[in-house]
Design a protein with these regions (language model features):
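Bacterial N-terminal signal peptides that target proteins for export
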Residues: 1-9
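Anionic, Ser/Thr-rich low-complexity intrinsically disordered regions
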Residues: 2-3, 22-112
Length: 112
């Protein structure tokens, strides 16, 4: 079961789902600028206190896309959505490059 969840998470990472929408600012650019970071729960979050509207929209769209994909995988595997999201979140944190932000289990933003 755990193997199946990890495989599903890996497939999600490879699916291109995390490339971000076609905003003026991509998800990767927002991460590189320290505006957005990965959360351990499998979603992205806003790092800065007063983000531009485009950043808020980007985060909302990416999280909606992720939630849909997590739900699809969870239904296929017969596991809770949270389990799929958590495993994917752990993988995303592992892949976060040095200098970018992530929120750990305590919810605080840290620079890797």
């Amino acid at each position: 079961m755990r193997y199946a969840l990890r495989l599903a998470a890996l497939l999600l990472l490879c699916s291109g789902l995390f490339a971000g929408p076609a905003f003026a600012l991509s998800l990767n650019e927002a991460k590189a600028q320290g505006l957005v970071g990965e959360r351990i729960d499998g979603f992205v979050g806003i790092v800065v206190a007063d983000p531009p509207t485009a950043v808020r929209q980007l985060v909302e769209q990416v999280n909606n896309q992720r939630r849909e994909k997590y739900d699809e995988v969870a239904k296929q595997r017969g596991v809770p959505l949270d389990a799929v999201a958590k495993i994917t979140g752990e993988k995303q944190l592992e892949r976060t490059p040095a200098g970018q932000y992530f929120a750990g289990a305590d919810g605080r933003w840290q620079q890797k």
